[in-house]
């Protein structure tokens, strides 16, 4: 049971989803024990509904939270299929972190990573992370068409990757020409988990999640393999813009089933007969 249950179920959320928070230090990803985690509805941030404490692994227990009906995430143009929560994390010696907009879907477990910066490295100000609308619910620019690099008509197939799978990629958090947008070094697997969680719903069938994950990995590895942006004078691997690449959202939550699927197939991608590089699906 939660350590301190303070509020009843959110109105109109007839289903439930699960949430677990994982808290680590930005220095060496060391787990932070005894961090205080306060959860509230994004629309009512001043009212705490749960207070939790992290264990020696930096994790909270899994808790149930109200979420919209499962059916909302199975059909387009339904009401928003996820509920949004704020998560505030406090720990002695660390900068407080506030995440606004953690997305809870019904019948799946959301995993919210939190990285805390030691106060010695910062000014003591709170770090705020705002998770925007999911790409299937919000308004995002459509993909700009690109020339087909591999003009082969046969359908793609899953092959064991011979392309080097990078440990990290550099994500430009904006459109390519925006020099003011920051670059982030992100572990490849973490990047894929983030994008899959941002572009599809974790409530979809396992086959649909597998298929979309393979497509997302293929797009990413195509950018890596072809040095697409570096050959154009940029110092990053891929952007977070849906107009150019695929949506990556700094600090967002992922989901337990997506986490597992990516770990299972992260070295695979889609290819075509006679074509060396991953296809840009």
Model-derived features: where do they sit?
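Intrinsically disordered, serine/threonine/proline
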Residues: 1-2, 26
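Conserved, single-site charged/polar hotspot
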Residues: 2-12, 34-38, 53, 59, ...
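Structural motif
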Residues: 8-10, 14-33, 40-44
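Short, surface-exposed loop/turn motifs at beta-strand boundaries within globular domains
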Residues: 14-16, 30-32, 45, 80-82, ...
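Short, acidic Ser/Thr/Gly-rich low-complexity loop/linker segments typical of extracellular
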Residues: 44-73
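A short, solvent-exposed loop/turn motif at the edges and junctions
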Residues: 70-100
């Amino acid at each position: 049971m939660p350590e301190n249950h303070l509020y009843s179920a959110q109105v109109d959320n007839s289903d439930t989803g699960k949430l677990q928070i994982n808290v680590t230090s930005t220095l060496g990803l060391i787990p932070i024990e005894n961090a205080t985690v306060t959860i509230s509805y994004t629309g009512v941030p001043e009212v705490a509904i749960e207070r939790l404490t992290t264990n020696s692994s930096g994790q909270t227990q899994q808790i149930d939270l109200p979420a919209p009906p499962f059916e909302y995430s199975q059909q387009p143009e339904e009401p928003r299929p996820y509920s949004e929560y704020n998560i505030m994390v406090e720990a002695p010696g660390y900068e407080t972190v506030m995440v606004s907009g953690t997305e809870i879907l019904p019948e799946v477990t959301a995993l919210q990573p939190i990285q805390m910066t030691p106060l010695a490295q910062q000014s003591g100000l709170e770090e705020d992370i705002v998770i925007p609308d999911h790409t299937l619910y919000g308004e995002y620019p459509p993909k700009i068409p690109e020339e087909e690099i591999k003009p082969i008509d046969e359908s793609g197939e899953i092959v064991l990757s011979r392309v080097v799978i990078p440990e990290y990629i550099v994500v430009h958090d904006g459109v390519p020409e925006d020099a003011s947008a920051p670059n982030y070094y992100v572990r490849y697997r973490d990047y894929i988990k983030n994008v899959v969680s941002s572009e599809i719903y974790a409530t979809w069938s396992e086959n649909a999640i597998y298929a979309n994950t393979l497509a997302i990995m293929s797009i990413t590895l195509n950018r890596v393999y072809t040095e697409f942006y570096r050959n154009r004078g940029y110092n990053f691997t891929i952007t977070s813009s849906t107009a150019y690449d695929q949506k990556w959202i700094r600090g967002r939550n992922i989901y337990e089933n997506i986490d597992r699927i990516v770990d299972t197939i992260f070295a695979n991608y889609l290819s075509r007969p006679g074509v060396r590089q991953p296809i840009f699906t």
